[in-house]
A protein has these predicted regions:
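Feature marks short, highly hydrophobic, charge-poor N-terminal signal-anchor/signal peptide-like helices
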Residues: 1-9
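Acidic/His- and Gly-rich active-site-bordering loop/insert found
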Residues: 8-141, 162-167
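An extended, acidic, His-containing surface patch that forms the Zn2+-binding/catalytic region
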Residues: 89, 99, 211-212, 271-337, ...
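A common structural junction motif
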Residues: 115-116, 265-270, 368-376
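Acidic/histidine-rich catalytic neighborhood of metal-dependent amide-processing enzymes
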Residues: 138, 144-224
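A short core secondary-structure module
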Residues: 187-192, 247-270
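Short, solvent-exposed beta-strand/turn "edge" segments of beta-rich domains on protein surfaces
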Residues: 228, 249-251, 321, 338-343
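Short amphipathic alpha-helices in soluble, non-transmembrane regions
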Residues: 252, 363-371
Length: 477
């Protein structure tokens, strides 16, 4: 009984300690902005990106149209002649690989981003393949996803080659033409590197970026560096019955069972929430920049508030909540073709994203058990597990964040969990440090434009992107 009386006092003391720690910790502001002195250079780079956007490189699942990508390669060769004439070039079915021999064969690095883009549908304010330069932005499909990165690392190499520079280690450039549908482009390039016996020290792909307000209540620009990808699966659930006329429905029809299943999953998620080390490091990094004292208190004292954070975070931010557990989103459905017919079979499609503490096998088993409870069968159409996390205390990540600091003074860098998928996943067999980061600024407008209408990138951030890749190449490994 005595211990029960002591417990509230201990709790109050712990909260008081957390409050004092927050009060004495200085609040920081992230006010990094690209230098205005780069306007002329920014416009020159914008012109190169514009020409790249003007070549339509739309790709489709199962599509095979190397001609359009060879037209894009011709444009690249015109824009970056030294890269194409001085580096060793390999093309495999439209996928590009360049090799730049360094002073040492130890710790080679690979810079990559994809050439292909998603279809551009709907009414755009600037034609999707115009490459218009207006209002401080370059407009068009692929501007941010991800021809800006391709332009930047090609330009970085082009300038260094013009200086007669030799990098300290071998450098590879890679660009697939099948990323948007998780095709076999990147695996073909990886197979070629494996044939050569290449083991990479570091891979830099798209994924993270310089993000404006990465979490609500944390204003400013932050370098969010992707350190692993969640796994994913497409799953079909099927309910069957004898069917019948809608005028005399029985209980537990196929659609009713599917609805009950969805309701249970949505109301009581079967997946565990856990604060992974990479996510905890992200919150600790961002905590001093929070605009409110309460958020600084919560994020800056995970030793005390981690259970509370796991409880409230999914309600505050769906993106941040997805970093805590496996997610499932119901996306497609089918049933009867007539309103007055109970279907003999109804189906429901879902997309799942697996977290490391409940990977592919466990998450699928959990959802299958729940589906069976409602009389549903489960079919996994496609699945792959999460990628191994980058060691955020390791040599490669430390070097990477140091280069960010050197290139973008005053910009805070934080580890970040990728809830989407990139080509970097295919490089895991030959690299333990596949880092996802595009050195450009993605504000709310750029985030909306990716795979949507009016995709664009602010051209003032392009010189910084080129400098970042140059600094990464120059860095002693």
């Amino acid at each position: 009984m005595k211990y029960l009386l002591i417990l509230p006092g201990v709790l109050v003391l712990l909260v008081l300690i957390a409050v004092v720690r927050t009060l004495v910790s200085p609040r920081k502001t992230s006010d990094y902005q690209p230098p205005q002195t780069d306007e002329a250079e920014a416009l020159r780079l914008a012109g190169k990106l514009s020409k790249m956007i003007q070549v339509d490189t739309t790709s489709h699942a199962g599509g095979d149209d190397p001609a359009r990508f060879r037209a894009f390669h011709k444009t690249l060769a015109e824009l970056f002649p030294r890269v194409f004439s001085q580096l060793e070039k390999t093309e495999i079915d439209g996928n590009l690989l360049f090799y730049w021999k360094g002073r040492s064969r130890e710790k080679p690095i690979l810079l990559m981003s994809h050439q292909d883009v998603v279809p551009a549908e709907g009414a755009w304010s600037h034609a999707p393949f115009s490459g218009d330069i207006a209002d401080g932005k370059v407009w068009g499909r692929g501007a941010s996803d991800t021809k800006c990165s391709v332009m930047a690392f090609f330009e970085a190499d082009e300038q260094l080659l013009a200086e007669g520079y030799t990098p300290p280690t071998d450098v590879y450039l890679a660009s697939s033409c099948t990323e948007e549908w998780a095709g076999d482009g990147a695996p073909k390039l990886v197979a070629e590197l494996q044939r050569r016996g290449v083991e990479l020290f570091l891979v830099c792909d798209e994924g993270g970026a310089i993000i404006s307000e990465p979490i609500g209540g944390i204003p400013g620009n932050f370098a969010m560096v992707g350190v692993f990808e969640k796994g994913k699966a497409d799953v079909k659930f099927t309910a069957k019955s004898t069917g019948g006329h809608a005028s005399a429905p029985g209980k537990h029809t196929p659609i009713a069972r599917l609805a009950a299943f969805v309701t249970e999953v949505e109301t009581h998620s079967p997946f565990k929430k856990k604060l992974l080390p990479e996510v905890a490091a992200m919150f600790r990094t961002l905590a001093p920049y929070a605009s409110s004292f309460g958020l600084r208190l919560l994020l800056g004292n995970l030793w005390l508030f981690a259970p509370l954070l796991k409880l409230v975070l999914p309600a505050v931010s769906a993106q941040a909540g997805a970093m805590l557990r496996t997610t499932i989103a119901f996306t497609t459905q089918s049933g009867s073709d007539a309103y007055n017919v109970i279907p003999q079979e109804a189906t429901l499609g879902a997309n799942m994203r697996f977290i490391p503490h409940q990977g592919e096998q466990e998450s699928l088993a959990i959802i299958q058990t729940l589906a069976e409870k409602h009389g549903l069968s489960t079919e996994v159409l496609h699945a792959n597990d999460f990628t191994p996390p980058v060691d955020i205390h390791g040599e490669a990540f430390t070097l990477f964040t140091r280069v960010i600091g050197e290139t973008f003074p005053g910009l805070a860098a934080s580890p970040y969990v990728m809830t989407g998928a990139t080509d970097a996943q295919f490089y895991q067999p030959i690299c333990k440090s596949c880092i996802r980061f595009a050195p450009v600024i993605y504000g709310p407008e750029q985030m909306r434009g990716m795979h949507g209408l009016n995709e664009n990138i602010e051209y003032r951030c392009l010189p910084g992107a080129v400098r970042f890749y140059q600094n990464l190449i120059r860095a002693e490994k």
